[in-house]
Amino acid sequence: MNMLMVMLVNITLSSCLIMIAFWLPQLNLYTEKANPYECGFDPMSSARLPFSMKFFLVAITFFLFDLEIALLLPLPWAIQMYNINTMMLTAFILVSVLALGLAYEWMQKGLEWTE
């Protein structure tokens, strides 16, 4: 019952915050909101620079593998648990899913930097 209550509160709070985040930006619509701030002067050029999609994919891949290391770091301490099979299976599934994702991105040539 306690876990159900915690999950219900978390889901409710998350839903409320997401709805507020989508609702609030629609209140203040004016043209100067999209312009960059340059000490009160009119902007000299566009502040919107094109963003490389290849860089974005490499950055996301780096972030995912960094997260994988953070999740697998406590694995040596988990060996002391009584149910080691469950922990090892979970770690194996995590590494397998990330390896499959890396193989897919590699086959789709998402990691090649040259265009």
Swiss-Prot record:
Disulfide bonds: none
Reactions catalysed: a ubiquinone + NADH + 5 H(+)(in) = a ubiquinol + NAD(+) + 4 H(+)(out)
EC number: 7.1.1.2
PANTHER family, alphabetized: NADH-UBIQUINONE OXIDOREDUCTASE CHAIN 3
BP-aspect Gene Ontology terms: mitochondrial electron transport, NADH to ubiquinone
Broad class of enzyme this protein falls into: translocase
Species of the source: Peromyscus mexicanus (Mexican deer mouse)
Protein localization: Mitochondrion inner membrane
GO CC annotation: mitochondrial inner membrane; NADH dehydrogenase complex
Gene Ontology MF terms: NADH dehydrogenase (ubiquinone) activity
Name this polypeptide is given: NADH-ubiquinone oxidoreductase chain 3
Transmembrane segments annotated in the record for this chain: 4-24, 55-75, 87-107
Membrane protein topology class: Multi-pass membrane protein
Subunit (UniProt): Core subunit of respiratory chain NADH dehydrogenase (Complex I) which is composed of 45 different subunits. Interacts with TMEM186. Interacts with TMEM242.
Pfam families for this protein: Oxidored_q4
Keywords for this protein: Electron transport, Membrane, Mitochondrion, Mitochondrion inner membrane, NAD, Respiratory chain, Translocase, Transmembrane, Transmembrane helix, Transport, Ubiquinone
Function: Core subunit of the mitochondrial membrane respiratory chain NADH dehydrogenase (Complex I) which catalyzes electron transfer from NADH through the respiratory chain, using ubiquinone as an electron acceptor. Essential for the catalytic activity of complex I.
Family: Belongs to the complex I subunit 3 family.
Top-rank taxon, per record: Eukaryota
